[in-house]
Amino acid sequence: DDLLASYKDNLANYQSLKATMLSKMFPKAGQTVPEIRLDGFEGEWVEKKLKDISKRVTRKNNDLVSERALTISAQFGLIDQEEFFQKKIASKDVSGYYLIKKGEFAYNKSYSTGYPLGAIKRLDKYENGVLSTLYILFKAVDVDSDYLAHYYESDKWHREVSMCAAEGARNHGLLNIAPADFFNTRLVIPKELEEQRAIGTYFINLDNLINSHQEKISQLETLKKKLLQDMFI
């Protein structure tokens, strides 16, 4: 029990550290340098429109390359619908869906608790998958992909998106934002690719620590359950 408690404490500390760093390692609105910066980097960051550093993806799943219907989960990112909901929500025919490939991004415009402006996630878990055409897909071009993935985990993009999002029909819970407006949103990025990479790597290492602790906690809880069952047989 002590071991389990210590892993849970460490996990909470790492999660808290990540939340703090996501708020402080990207500049606040109207600023061009972050509150906390990695050693060895200086100078102001630059403002870019998303369309200048990315390319929209609109390829359809015409040849049924994939039948893995994905959904965006706040905790797990882009994940197989069957794995997440324990059932398939998408229609039987997914040929009209977008085909997303590993490393590409998707913006889910539906808002939920803690995600007032929807969520933007990168596909990391599978080689490909399909998404409803309600999603906006893109890939990083003139920016480090790991940097961008973690920038969109912060709330720094919310202000820009909220300025061009008119709420659509409430019953769908979807934000009414046109792709052209979405790609015109501005973000501040380090001028040097090296700094972008360093930030991306910092957060990847932190994610790995969090994931390994979550796995260890899960293993210990399973073991504890088994030991308790054995005791009462």
Indicate where each model-derived feature is located.
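Short, flexible turn/loop "capping" segments at secondary-structure junctions
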Residues: K28-Q31, N128-V130, I177-A180, G200
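DNA target-recognition patches
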Residues: S54, T58-A90
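Proline-centric
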Residues: I136-D144, L175-R197, M231-F232
